[in-house]
Amino acid sequence: MAQNSLRLVEDKAVDKSKALDAALSQIERAFGKGSIMRLGANEQVVEIETVPTGSLGLDIALGVGGLPRGRIIEIYGPESSGKTTLALHTVAEAQKKGGICAFVDAEHALDPVYARKLGVDLENLLISQPDTGEQALEICDTLVRSGAIDVLVVDSVAALTPRAEIEGEMGDSLPGLQARLMSQALRKLTASISRSNTMVIFINQIRMKIGVMFGSPETTTGGNALKFYASVRLDIRRIGSVKDRDEVVGNQTRVKVVKNKLAPPFKVVEFDIMYGEGVSKTGELVDLGVKAGVVEKSGAWFSYNSQRLGQGRENAKLFLRDNPDTAREIELALRQNAGLIAEKFLENGGSEGGDDGFEDEAGAM
């Protein structure tokens, strides 16, 4: 009796295996070789390629060393918080590696002089200033399908105005039109983005929901589709000013990783964005160095390997700017201590409630 039941189980296993092989061959005949495969059959799972953001702290907070290629990224925040600056830094870093980048300027507000100061190679940057949202997204689709673009920036989702709205009267009510446009475009784009390994960065603005009694009234434009399709969502805020005596020379900026499908989310990092320069790399080296114990702080003095960097943060920044070899040594030490620093980011700001009251989303799916 036991032998009969054992034989029956073996026969069922053989039948299932044959049925699976038949199904796989049928799928490959219908849709082509490679349309379905066993994930670990032939080769190891390839690590995700990333592009640095221009901020060492943010690269560490993202957990994979930068923003991932072949994925959709959303950067949102209030006005003048550094959204476009962060996107342009990413473009500059991609170009340094020989990548081809494109910028869809739906806001018609890109400053080429500022972009050059951030390190963007304007001669090799493709730029489009479309008239309608449909035109902008068709251009994006064509560029992504070409497989030749490494980083594509759309600035911004709020400026992707549907054609019906442009052709209509000023007072016309067209509810949900932009959300439907974004939803359809993302359905088309998502497979092409993965195949072409193109990183698509959508810059987004914040709006207020009317009549919200509990929770944050803030929301992003363009509906909910982008929130779901994005692998990484960054909430960027201006939290203060950087002053040289009485003159304001930059912004203190906080970035929260609200969603991250590649590493634990809710990490918070702070850095300075200097006017005309972009992200202050030397400022980050000082701050992260103190966090990791690489740079020693005694009172107002900062020192590294018993060498004094300066009294006060600004003097330490100036020393590192004038001594690039020391700055390089500190950066190397920080990259080796990346795991320790990432834990500190989570300790400092990683509660799921979000200190800005913005609705957070768990990233690991």
From Swiss-Prot:
Taxonomic lineage: Bacteria, Pseudomonadati, Pseudomonadota, Alphaproteobacteria, Hyphomicrobiales
The protein, known as: Protein RecA
Keywords in alphabetical order: ATP-binding, Cytoplasm, DNA damage, DNA recombination, DNA repair, DNA-binding, Nucleotide-binding, SOS response
Top-level taxon: Bacteria
Any one Gene Ontology cellular component term annotated for this protein: cytosol
Species of origin: Mesorhizobium japonicum (strain LMG 29417 / CECT 9101 / MAFF 303099)
Family from the record: Belongs to the RecA family.
A single GO BP: SOS response
Localization: Cytoplasm
Positions contributing to ATP binding: G77, P78, E79, S80, S81, G82, K83, T84
Gene Ontology molecular-function annotations: ATP binding; ATP hydrolysis activity; ATP-dependent DNA damage sensor activity; damaged DNA binding; single-stranded DNA binding
InterPro entries on file: AAA+_ATPase, DNA_recomb/repair_RecA, DNA_recomb/repair_RecA_CS, P-loop_NTPase, RecA-like_C, RecA-like_N, RecA_ATP-bd, RecA_C_sf
PANTHER family named in the record: MITOCHONDRIAL DNA REPAIR PROTEIN RECA HOMOLOG-RELATED, RECA
SMART domains cross-referenced by the UniProt entry: AAA
The protein's role, per its UniProt record: Can catalyze the hydrolysis of ATP in the presence of single-stranded DNA, the ATP-dependent uptake of single-stranded DNA by duplex DNA, and the ATP-dependent hybridization of homologous single-stranded DNAs. It interacts with LexA causing its activation and leading to its autocatalytic cleavage.
Gene of this entry: recA
CDD domains to which the protein is assigned, alphabetical: RecA
Pfam families: RecA, RecA_C
